[in-house]
From Swiss-Prot:
<keyword id="KW-0150">Chloroplast</keyword>
<dbReference type="InterPro" id="IPR036967">
    <property type="entry name" value="Ribosomal_uS11_sf"/>
</dbReference>
<keyword id="KW-0687">Ribonucleoprotein</keyword>
<dbReference type="Pfam" id="PF00411">
    <property type="entry name" value="Ribosomal_S11"/>
</dbReference>
<protein>
    <recommendedName>
        <fullName>Small ribosomal subunit protein uS11c</fullName>
    </recommendedName>
</protein>
<dbReference type="GO" id="GO:0006412">
    <property type="term" value="P:translation"/>
</dbReference>
<keyword id="KW-0694">RNA-binding</keyword>
<dbReference type="GO" id="GO:0019843">
    <property type="term" value="F:rRNA binding"/>
</dbReference>
<dbReference type="GO" id="GO:0003735">
    <property type="term" value="F:structural constituent of ribosome"/>
</dbReference>
<keyword id="KW-0689">Ribosomal protein</keyword>
<dbReference type="InterPro" id="IPR001971">
    <property type="entry name" value="Ribosomal_uS11"/>
</dbReference>
<comment type="subunit">
    <text>Part of the 30S ribosomal subunit.</text>
</comment>
<dbReference type="GO" id="GO:0009507">
    <property type="term" value="C:chloroplast"/>
</dbReference>
<keyword id="KW-0699">rRNA-binding</keyword>
<dbReference type="GO" id="GO:0005840">
    <property type="term" value="C:ribosome"/>
</dbReference>
<dbReference type="InterPro" id="IPR019981">
    <property type="entry name" value="Ribosomal_uS11_bac-type"/>
</dbReference>
<dbReference type="GO" id="GO:1990904">
    <property type="term" value="C:ribonucleoprotein complex"/>
</dbReference>
């Protein structure tokens, strides 16, 4: 086989993906959106801090919406048509991020809440006295 007929794909190139998994991690301080393929390889990620929000503004629902729109726009540019959504965390931006994903036009096969809930595991930290 000659060198011209072989296709060489670079490692860091853009991967076209039809179906993916959108992970929404919503903490009280930030919202992180990670888009992976079905095997778990990260395609694109975005967060409220990466979108330019600093300090307490990172924890707002508007910042979560901006992060979700940023990640979805980049994944649609790479050819994503269908996705599954995995949400975790109790943060204020989880519903707003999901609303932004729904508006984007990507077909959602299912939405799953994967927030870890202890069956009375570790002792929680003491209550704050402000």
């Amino acid at each position: 086989m000659s060198n011209k007929s072989r296709k060489i794909r670079s490692r860091g190139g853009k991967r076209g993906v039809q179906k993916g998994v959108i992970h929404i991690q919503a903490s009280f301080n930030n919202t992180i959106i990670t888009v992976t393929d079905v095997r778990g390889q990260v395609i694109i990620w975005s967060s409220a801090g990466a979108c330019g929000f600093k300090g307490t503004r990172k924890s707002t629902p508007f910042a979560a919406q901006a992060a979700a729109e940023n990640a979805i726009k980049a994944s649609v540019d790479r050819g994503m048509k269908q996705a599954e959504v995995m949400m975790s965390g109790p943060g204020p931006g989880r519903d707003t991020a999901l609303r932004a994903i729904r508006r984007s036009g990507i077909i959602l096969s299912f939405i799953r809440d994967v927030t870890p809930m202890p069956y009375n595991g570790c002792r929680p930290p003491r209550k704050r006295r402000v």
